[in-house]
Amino acid sequence: MKIVLVFVCTLYLAQATYLSEQDVNEVSEFLEALDQANEAASEMVEAAETEEARDWECLPLHSSCDNDCVCCKNHHCHCPYSNVSKLEKWLPEWAKIPDALKRCSCQRNDKDGKINTCDKYKN
């Protein structure tokens, strides 16, 4: 009787493992398809932004910038951590602030009043 019980448990475990492997395969196939769709969408967005940049002769969205004039008309140069440089003189010598925190980038104009103030885009 014990042998039959062990055999049935083994079959059940094998069946459960097989179903789990099928589920894992289906999920991995779905994730691969999702990654491909995401890549295609991001390529389309990049192409559109590059075309916009060519039309305006300006930097596309999320490019590094120094001022509003290098960004496109509907973008502005945003420096989220512009005050970080002022903190550097107060930090000990061993503490370094990464350059990524000092980086400014072209961002979309928003409703909060953050707009491109460059003279060449004013009408």
Swiss-Prot record:
GO cellular component, one term: extracellular region
Keyword terms, alphabetized: Calcium channel impairing toxin, Disulfide bond, Ion channel impairing toxin, Knottin, Neurotoxin, Secreted, Signal, Toxin, Voltage-gated calcium channel impairing toxin
Propeptide: 17-54
The keyword Heme belongs to this UniProt entry's keyword annotation: no
Subcellular localization(s) per the UniProt record: Secreted
Any one GO MF annotation of this record: toxin activity
Protein name, entry field: Omega-oxotoxin-Ot1a
Main location: secreted
Family stated for the protein in its record: Belongs to the spiderine family. Spiderine subfamily.
Entry note about domains: The presence of a 'disulfide through disulfide knot' structurally defines this protein as a knottin.
Tissue: Expressed by the venom gland.
Other notes: The primary structure of the mature peptide is identical to that of omega-oxotoxin-Ol1a from Oxyopes lineatus (AC P0C8M0).
Annotated signal sequence range: 1-16
Record domain Oxytoxin-type inhibitor cystine knot (ICK): where: 55-122
Domain of life: Eukaryota
Disulphide linkage map: C58-C72, C65-C77, C69-C118, C71-C106, C79-C104
PROSITE patterns, alphabetized: OXYTX_ICK
Modification comment: Mass spectrometry data suggest a carboxylated free C-terminal residue.
Organism whose genome encodes this protein: Oxyopes takobius
Lineage, highest ranks first: Eukaryota, Metazoa, Ecdysozoa, Arthropoda, Chelicerata
Keyword Disulfide bond (UniProt): yes
Role, per record: Weak blocker of vertebrate P/Q-, N- and L-type voltage-gated calcium channels (Cav1 and Cav2). Is both paralytic and lethal when injected into lepidopteran larvae. Is not toxic to mice.
